[in-house]
Amino acid sequence: MSKRILITGAASGFGKIAAFDLAKKGHKVIATAQVYPQMSDLIREAKEQGIELTVDKLDVTNATDIAYITRKYDIDILISNAGIMEGGPVAEQPLDLIRSMFDVNVFGGLQLAQGFIKKFVDEKRPGKIVFTTSMGELWTVPYVAAYCASKHAMGSIAEGLKTELAPFNIKIATCNPGIFGTGFNDRGVDTISRWYDPETNFTPSSAFDDTAEALANQLDPQSMAECIVDVALDENSNFRNVHPKETEDFVKQLQADAWTAKS
C-alpha cells in the first residue's frame, strides 16, 4: 500500500537516497531541502532518473516554512533527517555555534514533529515519525561532544514521544547511523577550522589526529538509507535502530563500560 512520506534534509546523504528509493517503490514522497538551489538539483536529478518526486523548501529553523509544510501536506510518515554537525573541543567551542546546531538538530525537528502530530491526533488517524539521530546519541565522541549532546536530546525526546503518543496510534522510531561517507562527517570536522587556532586555543592540534583515520574508513551510505526506508515502512519496527551491527555491538560495549568509568 502506497504511503505519503515527507523527508527533511533530502538534498543529500541518507535523506536523498531514501527519498529516491521510496519513490521507486511507488510511495508518494515529498523531499524537502533547506534552500532553493538544492531543490533545483533534486528536481533535475529526479527527472533524469524518471522518478516521480515532490520537492519543496523546508528550513527546519524557519517557523514560516514549518507552518507552510504542515498545512500543505497530509502525510502518513515523517522522516526527520535534517541535521548539522559542529565540531571541536567543547570546552572551547563557541556557544553560538552550539546553539545554532541545537536549533536544527533538536528544536527544528521537534517543532516540525509537533505540527504533524497535531494533524494526526486531530484527524484521528495513525502516523509514524522516524528520527535520524546518530550512534552519538548513545555515547559521546570526543571533539564532537556538543553534536552528540544534540543527538542525546533528540533521542530522549523521541523516546518520550513514543510513550506519550502510543494511545493515539502514532509510532516513533530512531535510526542511529555509524560512520558513513555522505560528506556529513567531513563537513562537521571542517567546521573546526572556522574558529580553532592552535596559537590561541589550549587544545593541541594533535588532539584531532585520529579524525583523519576515522574519515578515511567511512561506510557506503546506501545500506544506512535502506535501513531508514525499512524502519519507516515497518509498522512493527524496533524503536532504536543502530546500523551497522558492528556499530551496535561497539556502542553496547561502551555503554557497559561507562558504569565503571572513573571521573
Stretches found by the model and what they are:
Residues 11-13:
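Conserved glycine-rich cofactor-binding loop
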Residues 81-86:
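Conserved NAD(P)H cofactor-binding loop of Rossmann-fold oxidoreductase domains
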Residues 89-90, 97-100:
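Substrate-binding pocket helix/loop in short-chain dehydrogenase/reductase
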Residues 113, 150-153:
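Active-site helix of classical SDR
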Residues 113-114, 159:
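A short, exposed helix-loop element centered on a Lys and neighboring polar residues
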Residues 134:
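Residue(s) in the substrate-gating loop at a strand-loop-helix junction
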Residues 167-237:
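SDR active-site lid
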